[in-house]
Each structure stands twice: as structure tokens, then as C-alpha cells.
């Protein structure tokens, strides 16, 4: 379509559709047709008008006019329109399918009607008369779309009147449509038979609907129109002010503008009406040419708005904030949220908006929407500013308090608007900010100061963390970032910065400082820069030194050595000549050594030469003084001085003995006399020859010396030289030694004499001992006579004493008899005491009989009496032991789940270890990579799994302390509770996904959701899911009964996998382990049922025994093989053995039906019943074969074939089954499979037909086994669980699920929600609406969003959280909720239990009617206080609901009143009957008491079961640990082999008595260049390579090498070279790499060099 003019080029009016030209005569039918076409055209114009108006309001394109009706059916555009004029009613978030993706994919959905309803509610909110409203079905079902367009037109006029939207255009006659489009619309209108609404009467209807006095309003509007025609502004304004016109916001200064605008509007309307009436026969309306009240008000608002905008623009130009605020308050604009205190903010924001608008090329003033946006932005900015000030104040207060965690918490406050803060660096923030705060003049940091400081400190924190983890890239990125604020960063010094920072970090740790500060980092950078600069200057200085040496001038050499940049130590001017001699000699030696005449000395060589020269000078001076002292001592005649001088270490004389001091002195004095006899030349100089071949000149007068020969030098003739002195000493010492040799033998004679004297003494001692031994009999006789005499005398004395004391003896006897009598009495008493326990037992037996009778009454009686129930009601209390058992149970569940995940992760890592060891053998990876992975395995990943579950305190994470995150957390808890307790959703979801995706989903999410069935509740719910899913699969997927056997049903696979894992592993082990172990231990058992195999084994055996080749053919058919008698014999033996061992397996299986997990048996029952329901004609045998396929073939058979893979048997690390053992087990499994399916051996296996009869007999046993296995109770009977169990359990269910699993589940539910829950009011739709769109991993964890390809994202997705599941739709005890009969019953029973415990009575009615005594009330209060104390100690996951806690605070009387209220409601609901005194409730309480006992028993059994599972998992972890040890020993062997092959040569003296040291290799760059290893060094000529040395040293870590570079002896840099990185580069085909960012090396040749020198390969 296109816009067209009303008049053609000739000025003739153009006919419209339906018009009749003057020369045109039409029939009645043609006129009707033309009229229908005109109606269609007019409606299309209205559609175009509505489309353009909505586009202006929404700011987005709508579908073409001919498709607009269809595009409005989903209500999205209508809902967006509702949001435009009433955002409070219609939120964008509540618009269903806002982007219309679902509509485009699947068409209309019933929930699209929500959008239409929201639009209608929005119109109702603003007050549009309901006479214009369409029905929902008019739009959704397209029953009356013109009604919708009519409503949009009315809405546009109404909004124009309110000043909320622009006026809709009148496009009649101004747009063109094709003939086809008009005909299509005509057909569409005729199809539905729709009566076209009167669009032209909208204004009048709207005025009538909104007015009180229609006649007065009509007259006032006509008067205004007449005044407009007169074009007198004063008259028009007077008419407008008529109260009956109901016009508002009139401003007299704008009267002339009102007149102009209204006059123009009326002229336009009259023109449009004229065009329309020329081509229409319908009845005209008075308002077709007159302006309606709404149009008048709309134009007034338009003028007011324009005027207000002009005033605002003027205020902005003048920069007057007060005038701007007054202009913004104009009612015509209707701006919301204006606050006078924010006037300056409005001025700033609107000036900015205006400037931006002008920059974009728009010069018109800011419009109303832009002003509102600016006001909102300014209010927000002002509010943020105030909040920011408050947050900054809190931060300063927290810094002053000195609590690092509190400071970081305040810094992380979003209202502070600070850069990102990292909690792990809390101490760093506290320390540095506190320092800055103290330095601040006002001791408070401003927001800009905090922003800069936090930004820099965060960067420093990241640097610290990167240094700890060794992340080099992150360290450099932060160092070079402008955010960090470091200065003088040089990229070429990058590696040095990193090395120094690593050392600084290590030093900080050693000093117990967790972080290095910004100042530390800046100082480190400055230090490195200084060192680099000094190195450069030092190299230049070394060059100057070498040049001076070549010139041969000692003074120039001295000046060069004294250059400060060289930093040479110990340079002395007086040693200049010796420096020259020493260094030039060293330079020549180096040139000869490397055969390069241009060789130069390096720094360490020059420094060494200086130190050596200084040392030589000191030693020469001491030597000269020592020789002079000897001469002086000899001349003085003092023997002591002479000996002391001779023994001085400075002169280096040997063989000096103190005993020969006088002889030395006399001999030297004699030598002196001989020199004197020759004559004295009186020279003051002496020349000494010193080590190194140099002469040292010593002045005897000044006692100084030097290396330079003095002018006119003459050697002093009187001084003894060292050689002369040494010669004299050697002669004297030799003579003394000969004399002492004789004196050395005196000790031998002394020792000989001592031995002789000792012999004589020993001989005398032995003689005395022999004499005494001969006299022993006589000595013994004398001693015995003496003892006998003494004993007889003592006896006689005792008899005499007793005879003299007879009275006393009688008294003693009487006392003894009394003691005996008393003892008999006491023994009798003790007898009674000893039998007190028997008496107590008798009494207890009587009491127990009474209690047993009461308990039998409680258990068996239909209506147990109140008295009996009251005795046992205390059993309903939760004791400390109950709480402890619940805590133990929760802890054990968590540990089991953690251990399951740990073992799974460990198993995956072990598999990866297998692969890496295999690659190691193929030289694809380095040994060190395997070693590092091995170290990782030893931790068993428990720490990692534990850390993954600690997400709760991350900033912005799912468990962050904010209302938004709390709502998100609760929404997920509600969702997963619904999924867990309603199996229909997951059962349908499984079959909505592809096979591979559903399997992964089940393995991860479903088992996690049910905590791997770690307790009774979760096992019950999981089995419900299995049951529902299996029934769904059979119903929708299975067309033939054999598909269960031939296919791979999803649910069956999941059930078998679950029950064969950790949960059913013990069962399989108990059933199969004994017989499997027996088979494996029988080494003689060899089952072969293939005749060809038997034949080949026989032939091989004959050839091995005879040593000759057999004449029999090797390749034969089974028939040919069976032709040999030996083969038949061996086959019969194998069959007998196979039948015997198979029978053992069969007996073990059929006798262990009770050991099979209940879940496995229950699913077998469900499978049988479901198949029978779908295939009623299937026989019993056919169904049992399917059950056999499940219980035996899928569940047991794999464990028999591969017992090692299913932990049926234990193998040592590295151990495995032999081929014969596997073949034996495979043959047995095949037999059992044939027996379970009643399949005979035929065809190719005809030679086994002899055991077909045995198979038939075995099938009958299997048949009875399968029938028994299916005979199990239903879930509710087995677990005693129903839909109300969660309302009374002590603890809330908790699951541990990863972030990735949460997001995956959320995504799948959104994608398939219509399939799994087709009903619109299904609860899951509400829960998914609560959650909204699928969140990102980062938003749930609390990390900042990063790169989509971030490799850490996968690790983040595995982070686990715990969700405490709750039910949103049934909250017991909530007073504001509608409580059903069950909830009221539970609450009432709980209160009754509390009352009857403390108040006795025969019936409940009697107790409720009898007032409680004060003693009963006091006892009740004490009990409630004890309960409150116990509840306070209860963990959050076990706390009771709020209403239960409130009930505990009631008195007995209040509780009785609440009970009576509950009983009244229950009576009305028909739950209880007051005629029998509410005996039903007493019976329910009795049942609860019985069930509480069963629950405790189940809990104990569950705890035992979990402990067994935990032990089994620990055993499996131990096995994995053994595998780890096995791998480590293998790796150690590889390392030992590698080390033993290394070609590290050692000198003999190093090999003997010393530990071997790490060898280091030194190469010049020139040598490496010759070998091809070094390609080039940037900025260095090849002829300078000889001055560069590379030193390669192995580190403590295998495969790591430290490479040091020196230039002219100056230590430049150190580079860590990783052998595994080299291999990786080689594997990737990288031929060249850089060292030190400058030296390019050949990767392959470098690997070859390292292998050759360090690994010997």
C-alpha cells in the first residue's frame, strides 16, 4: 500500500472504493458489491490507523496491515500496549512469550490469553468505559477482530484526552490497498458475518459514558465548536471554561494558541468527514464534523504540553534549576516522582540529555517521555548518591573498627558503587585502607579516594592470587594494566618482574605476611628497572676495561677499573701494576684456552683478578715483613723472638720445632756472620720472589713495598733470604729427629716390667682361694650347730610364757567363738543382699506383665482406652537420641553421596591415568605430566568435592544474603520438591529428549535429585519414578512384547544400572561371590564346548609332548573334530564339569531371592503387570521370560561374565582374570542364560543337545524363582509412606546438586513444559514463572561473567550447592492458608498429645471439660521450656514449623480451647464423631505411637545400611588407592630407568665418599649456534655470541631445568624450562621457541641436547 493524494494531477476528485461516477450506472447487485468493498476498505484503513498508532506508542514495527489481526491474536502487542500506558498493572516480565518465539515455533497456546486479560485489566485501571471492551475469545479465537480494533481506536482517543499518547490519525482515503487485499478482507468479514462497529461515533459514546449530564455536556461541546468557528480567542476560552464541558488544565495565557489548534483540528475533521460521506450511505453522526469533548481536551493537553516543554527548554538554556523545577511541575506533563531537593540533579541530567540529542542531529526540545526518563534517572542518581554517601560512611567506620571481614562486606555493598572486591584479600584491604585513612586530613576516605584505592588493591589482590597459583599471564596483565597504577613498567623486563615478585611473595609468606602490597610491587618494579640499567652500564664499563688492558698502560687500566658503573670492589691505586699484570695474563690464558685471540675478560674474571691481586699484595707484604723480622731477631740475639718469627705463618717456613729454637738461632747467626764477612752494601731494598712468578720489592727502612722495581735497585747483601733460612731450619730439624728416635723406645721396657709384677700377685691370690675351698665341710657344721641351739632356746621361752598367761588365752578363745557366730549372721544377711536382683526381677516381671497387657491393648484393641494411650504417649516425643540419630543419618547420607561422587571422579581420573601412561610409552607426553597427575590422585579429590559445595558466601551467588537471591533459592527448592514428589513430570521429560541426552540426564540429575536413594523416603520416591516412567514407556514406546528383550528400554537400563551399582553391589556380591571364587580357585577346571577348540588344544598338546609335528590337519570342521574319540572324551568331560558348576550357580541364585534388592523385585513386578495390562493375551511363560531377561540377563549375567568389573571379587592392583577363568565363567553364564529363557542348544550347537533336558529342568527352577521375585508388597506397604509423610517428619529433605545440573534441568523443563504439563493450571507452570528465564552459571555462583569459551566454566558448572526442599502448595500450620481436613487433624492431634500427658481422664471429652490444676499447668510449662531449649539446639534443617513453635507457647487451657475449635471443624467435615467422645482421634494417636516405633526401627536399619554402603565405598576407594600405588610404583620405575641412563660424568674424587650432585651444563651461545640449537639473539651480532654463556641446570622437580644467561660475565636473566612444554611444542609442530623473549632456539635440537646430556637417550 502507499499514501496517495485526494486529488489527481488535473484537480479532479479521485473516486474511492464504492463510489459511483456521474457517467456510471450500476445494478443493485453491483452497488451491494461496491458497498461491501467500501466497508472492507474502510476497515483496512482503521487497521492501518491502529497499526501506526501502536507503532508510535511501542516504538517497534508491527506486522503488515493485512496480517495485523493474526498478529494480535497472541496478545503480546496488546500486553505491551498495556505496559505502555499502565506499567503498574502490566509488567514486561509477566507478558507470556514476550519475544513470540513459542508462538512462531508452535502457534497459539492457551496461556497467550493471559496477555489479552492483562491488556483488559490495564484499560480498566485507567478507566476506559467497558462498553468498548472486546471478549477474550473475540481476539484469541478471532471471532470478532473488528471489535478489538474498535477498542484500540477508543483507547487511543481516551489516552489522547489524558495526554498519555498521541492522537490516532484518520487515514481514510489516504492509503491504497490492492484489489486482492480488499477482496480478501471482504471475504473474511462475510465469512464471520461480523457487524462493523461505528468507528465515527467513538467520540460521542466516550463523552456520554464519561459525563454525568449528557445533555449539558452536549450543549457545552456544541457551544465550544461554534466559538471555534468565530475564531475569537476570548470567546473560545470562555466557552472552554464552561463547567458542563468538563475540561481541565485550562491556561488563559494560551487562549490564542487553543483557538488556532482547535480550529485547525476541526477543519481537518470536517475535511475527512466530507471525504467519507461522499462514499458512504450510512447514517451520519453529529460528531463526524464537530470536535468531541475528548478531542478538545486532547488538543488542550497538546498545547499545554508544548508550552510546558518550551518553558523547560528555556529554563535549561538559562541554567535556572528553580525555574526548571517549576516548569517540570506543569500538570500537562504529569511527570512522576518530582522532588524539589533534586532540582540540581534534574538540571544536570536534562542538560546532558539535551546535549546528546543535539549531537545526534535533533534540535527540537526534550519530549515528555525523555523528560520523565531524565527525571527518573536524576532521582535514581540522587538516591544512589545518598546511598553511596551512607555506604562510604559505613566503610570508614568499618575500617576504623579494624575487622577485615566487616570492611570487605561493606566494600562489597552494591550501593557503595566501588570496583570489584575480592573477599580472599580482606586483610589487604583493611591494612592498606586503614593506612590511607590515617593519612587523610579528616581521617575519612571520600568515594573517589576509595574507588581509586579499591581498584588498585583489587588488582594487587589478583596479582597476589596469580603469584600463588603461578598464573604468569594474569600477573603480567595486572602489572601492565593502568588500573593497577604502577609506573615505569617495561615490557622487556616482564620475566624479571615475575621472578622478583615470586621471590618477594615467598619472603612475605616466610614472614607470615599473606599479601605483598602495592608499595612492595612498585618498589620491586623500580628495583628491577635499576638492576637492568646497571647491568647495561656495567657491560659498557667492562668493554672499556678490556680496551685499557690491551693498551698496556697500568694507569689507564686503573682508571677503567675505578668506573662506578662497573661496581668492582677492592680497587687500590698502589696495586695498579699488579692489576695490569694479573689481568693481562688471565686474558692471554683465556685466549689460549678458547683459541680466540680476540677473547675478552668478563665481569667475574676481572673481579677475580682484582681480588687475587689484592690478596697477592697482602701476602707479599706480610711475607717481606716476616723475613725482615727473622733477620732482626737473629741480629738481636733473642732466641725466643727468633723462634716466634720462624713460626709465623706469613713466611711459610716448614719443619720448625720449638725444641730446636736455640739451635735454629745459632745456625742462622752463623750464616749472618758469613754474610758480614763478605761485606755490607748498605742497600735499603730487598727483592722477594713470590707465588705466581712475580717479584715484590720491600724497603727495609719504611717497611713498605710494591710491585714496581725501584730506580737504581740493588739487593741488600746482609739480609737472609727465605731459601737460606729454610735450608738452615731443615738441617737442624733433621738432626733433632734422629736424636728423638732413640728416646722413643723407653716406654716398651716399662710395660714389660709391669706385666711381670702382675703375674706374681695373681699367683698368690689363687693359692689363698684353694685353701678356703678345702675347709668348706668344717665351716658348714659349725654354722648348723649354732642355729639349732638358738631355735631350741626360743621354743622353751615361748612355752614358759604361755603357761604364765592362762586367763588371757581363755579370753582370746571366747572372742574367737563370738567372731564365728557373728560371721554366720552376717553371711545370712549377705545372702539376702546377694539375691536382691532376683527380687527386683520378680517385681519387674510383675510390672512388665502389666505394661505388656497395656501395650497389647494399645496394639490390638479397636478402641484403646485413654488411660492406656496416656501411658505410651511419651513415645511420640523426640528425645536427644532421636535428634542425634537424625543428625548421624543426615551426616552419613552426605558422606555417602560425597564418597560416591569422589569415587566416580577418582575412577575417571584413573582412566585418564591409564591413557596417560599409555601415551608415555608412546612418547606422546612427558613423565612429569603423569607424575603430577599421580599426585593429584593421591588426594582422591575429596578436598575438591568439599570445596565445590562451599558456594554460599560468594558475592551475588544463589545463597547470597539478598531478597532476590533468597526468592530464587526458594523457587528452586519448591521446583525440585515438586519434581521429586510428583514422578509424572520427570517420567514424561525422559521421553521428550533424545536417547543419548536422556541417559546423561538420568545418570546425573535424577539420581542426584533422589540422593542416590540414600534413605527410605528417597528410595520410595525414586521407585515411584521408576514405576511411572516404566509404565509410560510401555504405554507409549512398546508395540510388541519382545521389544523389551530385543531393544534397550531406557527405564530398564536405568533401573539395572542403579541396582547393580553401589546400592545393589553387596547383594550381587553375597549371591555370586562364593561360587565365583570357587570356580576361580579351581585351577584344574577348563570348560571348552567348541569341538574345534578342543581338537586344536589336543593337537598342540601332542606336538608339545612328542616334539614332532602332528600329521593331523590343523583346520577342521566341528564334525571332523568330533570324529576323533579323544575330542569326544574331552567334550563329554567339559559338559559334565559345566553342568556341575552351573548347578552350583543355579542353586545360589534361586535360593537368594530375599537377597535381591527390593527395588529390583518391585520393578520386575511393575514390568510384569504393565505388560500383562497392555498385552492381555500374553501367556504366563512369555511374561516370566521377560522377567528373566531383566533379573538374570540384565542384572546378574554381566556380573558372572566379568566379576572383576562389578566388584564381585577382590583383585590386587594390577591383577586380572586369566583367559581360562573368563572362558569358564562365560560358558556358565551362557548355560544359565539358556536356562532362564528356556532356550535349547540346536543347529551349530547340536553337539550340546545332550544337556537340553537339564536346561528344561533348570528353567522350571528359574520360573519359580521369577514368580517368587515378583511377589513383593506395594511401595506404600513396604515403606509406610504416603503423601502426608513429609508433614510429620523430623527433618526436611536436602539434596546436593551442581550448578550445571540446576541449569540443565531448568532449561529442559522450559523447553518441554507444554508436553509434561499440558494443563494451564498445573503447579509446575507457576513455579517456572517464579524462576523466570534460565540464569547463567556466573549468576548462580556469584562470579563476574567472563568469556563464553572460558575453560574454567566447565569446572564452575560442577560447583555443588545444597537445597533444602520445601513444598510451596501445602504449608501445614499456616493460619492464613486454607487448611484441609488432614492438616487440621494433624494439628489437633499434636495438641491433644500435649494435653493428655499432663491431665488425666477417662475420655477426651472429660479432659477437655475439666479445668487444669495449677500443678498440671506448672508441669506443662516446665516440659514446654525443656522442649524449647532442645529445639534451640536443633539444626535449621530439622526445625519445626512456625505454627508448631507458637503452639508450644500456649497454656493447657489455651490448647484445650484450640482443640475444641479443631474438633468442631473436623466434626463439620465428617472426620470425627462427638457421639463416641472422639475415639477416632485416640485411635489415630495410638496408631502414631505404633508407627513411631517402626520409624525408629527403620531409621536404625537405614543407618546400618548407609554405614554398610559407606564401608563398601571406602573399600572401593581403598582399591583405587592400591591402583594409585601401583601406578606410582610403575612411574617410579620409569624415573629410575631414566636416571640410570643419564650420562652424568663425575670426577674420581667426587665419586669417592661424596654424594652425587646435580650436574650443570655450560655452553657459549657460539657453541649452541654451531650445534644448531640457538638460531639467533635479537639485537646481538653473531660475532658477539662468544661473550654469552647459557648454563642449564636440572632442578629438584624431574623434567624442569633452570637456564641462566650471562653476557660478558654479567648475570642477565633466569628462565625456567619445562621439558613437558618442549614435548608439547614438538607434538604441536612448533619448530622454534623463544628463551628470555630474545633468544630463538630450535625445539627439536634442544630436546635432543637435553636427552643426550641428562637422560642418556
Swiss-Prot record:
Tissue: Expressed in the placenta, lung, and kidney. A lower level expression is seen in the heart, liver, skeletal muscle and pancreas.
InterPro entries: CH_dom, CH_dom_sf, IQ_motif_EF-hand-BS, P-loop_NTPase, RasGAP_C, RasGAP_CS, RasGAP_dom, Rho_GTPase_activation_prot
GO molecular function: actin filament binding; cadherin binding; calcium ion binding; calmodulin binding; GTPase activator activity; GTPase inhibitor activity; MAP-kinase scaffold activity; molecular adaptor activity
One GO term (biological process): regulation of mitotic cell cycle
Modified residues (N-acetylserine): 2
Quaternary structure, from the entry: Interacts with CDC42; the interaction is demonstrated with IQGAP1 in GTP-bound and in nucleotide-free state. Interacts with RAC1. Does not interact with RHOA. Interacts with TSG101. Interacts with PAK6. Interacts with TMEM14B; this interaction increases IQGAP1 phosphorylation and induces its nuclear translocation. Interacts with SASH1. Interacts with PJVK. Interacts with SLC26A4; this interaction enhances the chloride-bicarbonate exchange activity of SLC26A4. Interacts with SVEP1. Interacts with ILK; the interaction is required for localization of IQGAP to the cell cortex.
Protein purpose: Plays a crucial role in regulating the dynamics and assembly of the actin cytoskeleton. Recruited to the cell cortex by interaction with ILK which allows it to cooperate with its effector DIAPH1 to locally stabilize microtubules and allow stable insertion of caveolae into the plasma membrane. Binds to activated CDC42 but does not stimulate its GTPase activity. Associates with calmodulin. May promote neurite outgrowth. May play a possible role in cell cycle regulation by contributing to cell cycle progression after DNA replication arrest.
Protein name from the UniProt record: Ras GTPase-activating-like protein IQGAP1
Organism: Homo sapiens
